[in-house]
Amino acid sequence: MAGHSKWANIKRQKARVDAKKGSLFTKLSRAIIVAARNGLPDPDGNFQLRAAVEKAKAAGMPSENIERAIAKGAGNWSDDSPLEEVRYEGYGPGGVAVLIEAMTDNRNRTAAEVREAFSKTGGSLGEAGCVSWLFRQKGVISLEEVLDPEALLLAVAEAGGDDFKVEGTGAEVYCDYSLLEQVATYLKKEGYPVQDAAIRWIPSTEVHVEDPDTAKSVLALMERLDNLDDVQNVYANFEIDEAVMESLA
Protein backbone atom coordinates (compact mmCIF):
# COMPACT_ATOMS: atom_id res chain seq x y z
CA MET A 1 0.00 0.00 0.00
CA ALA A 2 1.78 3.10 -1.24
CA GLY A 3 -0.02 5.43 1.11
CA HIS A 4 0.70 3.32 4.13
CA SER A 5 4.33 2.88 3.10
CA LYS A 6 4.72 6.64 2.81
CA TRP A 7 3.07 7.17 6.20
CA ALA A 8 5.36 4.52 7.74
CA ASN A 9 8.39 6.41 6.41
CA ILE A 10 7.05 9.68 7.82
CA LYS A 11 6.51 8.03 11.20
CA ARG A 12 10.05 6.65 11.27
CA GLN A 13 11.49 10.09 10.51
CA LYS A 14 9.23 11.72 13.09
CA ALA A 15 10.20 9.13 15.71
CA ARG A 16 13.78 10.40 15.63
CA VAL A 17 12.54 13.92 16.35
CA ASP A 18 10.09 12.69 19.00
CA ALA A 19 12.90 10.83 20.76
CA LYS A 20 14.78 14.09 21.19
CA LYS A 21 11.84 15.84 22.83
CA GLY A 22 10.86 12.87 24.96
CA SER A 23 7.39 12.18 23.56
CA LEU A 24 8.48 8.87 22.05
CA PHE A 25 9.77 7.73 25.45
CA THR A 26 6.38 8.54 26.96
CA LYS A 27 4.63 6.27 24.46
CA LEU A 28 7.18 3.49 24.87
CA SER A 29 7.00 3.71 28.66
CA ARG A 30 3.23 3.39 28.60
CA ALA A 31 3.44 0.35 26.35
CA ILE A 32 5.79 -1.29 28.87
CA ILE A 33 3.50 -0.42 31.79
CA VAL A 34 0.45 -2.01 30.17
CA ALA A 35 2.39 -5.09 29.01
CA ALA A 36 3.73 -5.64 32.54
CA ARG A 37 0.26 -5.11 34.00
CA ASN A 38 -1.39 -7.58 31.61
CA GLY A 39 1.09 -10.39 32.24
CA LEU A 40 4.19 -11.32 34.18
CA PRO A 41 6.43 -8.32 35.03
CA ASP A 42 9.35 -10.32 33.60
CA PRO A 43 10.35 -9.92 29.94
CA ASP A 44 11.58 -13.52 29.80
CA GLY A 45 8.10 -14.82 30.60
CA ASN A 46 6.01 -12.15 28.87
CA PHE A 47 6.40 -11.82 25.10
CA GLN A 48 4.42 -8.58 24.88
CA LEU A 49 6.62 -7.02 27.55
CA ARG A 50 9.80 -8.35 25.96
CA ALA A 51 8.83 -6.82 22.61
CA ALA A 52 8.03 -3.48 24.28
CA VAL A 53 11.34 -3.46 26.15
CA GLU A 54 13.32 -4.32 23.01
CA LYS A 55 11.60 -1.50 21.15
CA ALA A 56 12.40 0.92 23.98
CA LYS A 57 16.04 -0.13 24.04
CA ALA A 58 16.31 0.29 20.27
CA ALA A 59 15.02 3.85 20.67
CA GLY A 60 17.68 4.58 23.29
CA MET A 61 15.47 4.70 26.35
CA PRO A 62 17.61 4.62 29.55
CA SER A 63 17.53 1.35 31.51
CA GLU A 64 16.25 3.08 34.65
CA ASN A 65 13.22 4.38 32.71
CA ILE A 66 12.47 0.88 31.46
CA GLU A 67 12.80 -0.63 34.93
CA ARG A 68 10.57 2.07 36.42
CA ALA A 69 7.90 1.41 33.79
CA ILE A 70 7.97 -2.33 34.52
CA ALA A 71 7.66 -1.60 38.25
CA LYS A 72 4.66 0.65 37.62
CA GLY A 73 2.99 -2.05 35.58
CA ALA A 74 3.62 -4.59 38.32
CA GLY A 75 2.10 -2.26 40.91
CA ASN A 76 5.39 -1.75 42.71
CA TRP A 77 5.53 1.98 42.05
CA SER A 78 3.15 4.48 43.59
CA ASP A 79 1.21 6.44 41.00
CA ASP A 80 -1.74 8.70 41.77
CA SER A 81 -2.94 8.62 38.16
CA PRO A 82 -3.12 5.02 36.89
CA LEU A 83 -3.25 4.52 33.14
CA GLU A 84 -6.13 2.83 31.36
CA GLU A 85 -6.42 1.58 27.81
CA VAL A 86 -9.09 3.23 25.67
CA ARG A 87 -10.07 2.96 22.02
CA TYR A 88 -11.58 5.61 19.77
CA GLU A 89 -13.17 5.21 16.35
CA GLY A 90 -14.13 7.65 13.66
CA TYR A 91 -14.15 8.64 10.03
CA GLY A 92 -11.50 10.75 8.37
CA PRO A 93 -11.66 12.74 5.13
CA GLY A 94 -13.02 10.75 2.18
CA GLY A 95 -14.77 8.25 4.45
CA VAL A 96 -11.52 6.69 5.68
CA ALA A 97 -12.09 4.52 8.76
CA VAL A 98 -9.77 5.31 11.67
CA LEU A 99 -9.13 3.25 14.80
CA ILE A 100 -7.09 4.71 17.67
CA GLU A 101 -5.56 2.95 20.67
CA ALA A 102 -4.65 5.20 23.58
CA MET A 103 -3.40 4.99 27.15
CA THR A 104 -4.56 7.76 29.41
CA ASP A 105 -4.91 8.93 32.99
CA ASN A 106 -7.72 11.29 31.96
CA ARG A 107 -10.38 10.05 29.52
CA ASN A 108 -12.00 13.48 29.13
CA ARG A 109 -8.73 15.14 28.11
CA THR A 110 -7.83 12.44 25.62
CA ALA A 111 -11.30 12.31 24.05
CA ALA A 112 -11.25 16.09 23.60
CA GLU A 113 -7.82 15.99 21.95
CA VAL A 114 -8.80 13.15 19.61
CA ARG A 115 -12.07 14.89 18.70
CA GLU A 116 -10.20 18.09 17.89
CA ALA A 117 -7.78 16.22 15.62
CA PHE A 118 -10.72 14.86 13.62
CA SER A 119 -12.58 18.17 13.42
CA LYS A 120 -9.47 20.14 12.37
CA THR A 121 -8.93 17.86 9.36
CA GLY A 122 -12.48 17.33 8.13
CA GLY A 123 -13.21 14.08 9.93
CA SER A 124 -15.50 13.11 12.79
CA LEU A 125 -15.09 11.09 15.98
CA GLY A 126 -17.73 8.34 16.09
CA GLU A 127 -19.32 5.97 18.56
CA ALA A 128 -17.68 2.78 19.80
CA GLY A 129 -18.01 0.07 17.16
CA CYS A 130 -18.64 2.40 14.22
CA VAL A 131 -15.54 1.27 12.29
CA SER A 132 -13.95 -1.59 14.26
CA TRP A 133 -15.96 -4.09 12.21
CA LEU A 134 -13.87 -3.02 9.21
CA PHE A 135 -10.67 -4.28 10.89
CA ARG A 136 -9.39 -7.58 12.21
CA GLN A 137 -6.62 -8.20 14.72
CA LYS A 138 -3.52 -9.91 13.37
CA GLY A 139 -0.03 -10.60 14.55
CA VAL A 140 2.44 -8.52 12.53
CA ILE A 141 6.20 -9.09 12.47
CA SER A 142 8.27 -6.38 10.78
CA LEU A 143 11.50 -7.55 9.14
CA GLU A 144 14.22 -4.99 8.51
CA GLU A 145 15.62 -6.59 5.38
CA VAL A 146 14.57 -9.43 3.09
CA LEU A 147 17.02 -10.67 0.47
CA ASP A 148 15.09 -13.74 -0.73
CA PRO A 149 11.27 -13.46 -0.78
CA GLU A 150 10.87 -17.08 -1.89
CA ALA A 151 12.85 -18.33 1.11
CA LEU A 152 10.78 -16.07 3.37
CA LEU A 153 7.56 -17.53 1.95
CA LEU A 154 8.71 -21.00 2.98
CA ALA A 155 9.87 -19.80 6.41
CA VAL A 156 6.54 -18.07 7.08
CA ALA A 157 4.63 -21.25 6.21
CA GLU A 158 6.87 -23.38 8.43
CA ALA A 159 6.52 -20.89 11.29
CA GLY A 160 2.72 -21.04 11.13
CA GLY A 161 2.26 -17.61 9.58
CA ASP A 162 -0.35 -16.64 7.00
CA ASP A 163 1.33 -14.34 4.53
CA PHE A 164 3.81 -11.51 4.10
CA LYS A 165 4.06 -8.25 2.19
CA VAL A 166 7.28 -6.68 0.94
CA GLU A 167 7.66 -3.11 2.21
CA GLY A 168 10.66 -1.37 0.64
CA THR A 169 13.72 -3.50 1.42
CA GLY A 170 11.94 -5.21 4.32
CA ALA A 171 8.67 -7.05 4.83
CA GLU A 172 5.71 -7.45 7.15
CA VAL A 173 4.71 -10.98 8.10
CA TYR A 174 1.10 -11.66 9.11
CA CYS A 175 -0.17 -14.41 11.37
CA ASP A 176 -2.98 -15.26 13.78
CA TYR A 177 -2.39 -12.98 16.77
CA SER A 178 -2.33 -16.00 19.10
CA LEU A 179 0.73 -17.29 17.19
CA LEU A 180 2.69 -14.02 17.23
CA GLU A 181 5.37 -15.18 19.66
CA GLN A 182 5.74 -18.54 17.88
CA VAL A 183 6.18 -17.00 14.43
CA ALA A 184 8.48 -14.19 15.57
CA THR A 185 10.68 -16.61 17.53
CA TYR A 186 10.95 -18.97 14.56
CA LEU A 187 11.92 -16.20 12.14
CA LYS A 188 14.57 -14.91 14.56
CA LYS A 189 15.92 -18.43 14.90
CA GLU A 190 16.17 -18.65 11.09
CA GLY A 191 18.23 -15.46 11.04
CA TYR A 192 15.63 -12.95 9.90
CA PRO A 193 16.15 -9.42 11.30
CA VAL A 194 12.94 -8.97 13.33
CA GLN A 195 12.48 -5.25 13.94
CA ASP A 196 9.12 -5.37 15.69
CA ALA A 197 6.38 -7.84 16.61
CA ALA A 198 2.96 -6.66 17.69
CA ILE A 199 -0.77 -7.27 17.50
CA ARG A 200 -2.31 -4.76 15.11
CA TRP A 201 -5.65 -3.93 13.56
CA ILE A 202 -5.55 -4.74 9.83
CA PRO A 203 -8.27 -3.31 7.55
CA SER A 204 -10.43 -5.88 5.75
CA THR A 205 -11.42 -3.33 3.08
CA GLU A 206 -9.63 -0.25 1.79
CA VAL A 207 -10.72 3.22 0.73
CA HIS A 208 -8.85 4.46 -2.35
CA VAL A 209 -8.07 8.15 -1.96
CA GLU A 210 -7.48 9.65 -5.40
CA ASP A 211 -7.97 13.36 -4.75
CA PRO A 212 -4.71 15.09 -3.66
CA ASP A 213 -6.47 17.49 -1.29
CA THR A 214 -8.28 14.62 0.42
CA ALA A 215 -5.04 12.65 0.63
CA LYS A 216 -3.33 15.65 2.22
CA SER A 217 -6.11 15.92 4.81
CA VAL A 218 -5.95 12.19 5.58
CA LEU A 219 -2.20 12.36 6.21
CA ALA A 220 -2.70 15.51 8.31
CA LEU A 221 -5.20 13.62 10.48
CA MET A 222 -2.80 10.70 10.89
CA GLU A 223 -0.03 13.05 11.96
CA ARG A 224 -2.23 15.02 14.37
CA LEU A 225 -3.39 11.83 16.07
CA ASP A 226 0.10 10.35 16.21
CA ASN A 227 1.41 13.57 17.79
CA LEU A 228 -0.89 13.17 20.80
CA ASP A 229 1.03 11.85 23.81
CA ASP A 230 -1.87 9.63 24.92
CA VAL A 231 -2.22 7.94 21.52
CA GLN A 232 -0.24 4.73 21.15
CA ASN A 233 -1.36 3.43 17.76
CA VAL A 234 -3.39 4.73 14.83
CA TYR A 235 -4.88 2.42 12.20
CA ALA A 236 -6.72 3.44 9.03
CA ASN A 237 -7.97 1.79 5.86
CA PHE A 238 -6.76 4.28 3.26
CA GLU A 239 -4.88 3.51 0.06
CA ILE A 240 -3.16 6.38 -1.75
CA ASP A 241 -1.57 5.83 -5.15
CA GLU A 242 2.13 6.55 -5.48
CA ALA A 243 1.47 9.27 -8.08
CA VAL A 244 -0.76 11.14 -5.64
CA MET A 245 1.81 10.77 -2.86
CA GLU A 246 4.51 12.16 -5.13
CA SER A 247 2.34 15.17 -5.97
CA LEU A 248 2.19 15.98 -2.25
CA ALA A 249 5.95 15.73 -1.72
UniProtKB/Swiss-Prot annotation:
Instruction: Quote the Gene3D superfamilies the UniProt record gives.
Output: 1.10.10.200, 3.30.70.980
Q: Does the keyword Transcription regulation apply?
A: yes
InterPro entries on file? Integrase-like_N, TACO1_YebC-like_2nd/3rd_dom, TACO1_YebC_N, Transcrip_reg_TACO1-like, Transcrip_reg_TACO1-like_dom3, YebC-like
**Pfam families linked to this entry:** TACO1_YebC_N, Transcrip_reg
Q: Which residues form a coiled coil?
A: none
| GO terms for biological process, alphabetical | regulation of DNA-templated transcription
Q: Does the keyword Mitochondrion apply?
A: no
A GO molecular-function annotation: DNA binding
> Chief location of this protein?
cytoplasm
**GO cellular component terms, semicolon-separated:** cytosol
Q: Where does it localize?
A: Cytoplasm
Which cysteine pairs are joined by S-S bonds? none
Entry keyword set: Cytoplasm, DNA-binding, Transcription, Transcription regulation
Q: Which PANTHER family match?
A: TRANSCRIPTIONAL REGULATORY PROTEIN YEBC-RELATED, TRANSLATIONAL ACTIVATOR OF CYTOCHROME C OXIDASE 1
Q: Which family does it belong to?
A: Belongs to the TACO1 family.
What name does this protein carry? Probable transcriptional regulatory protein CYB_1350
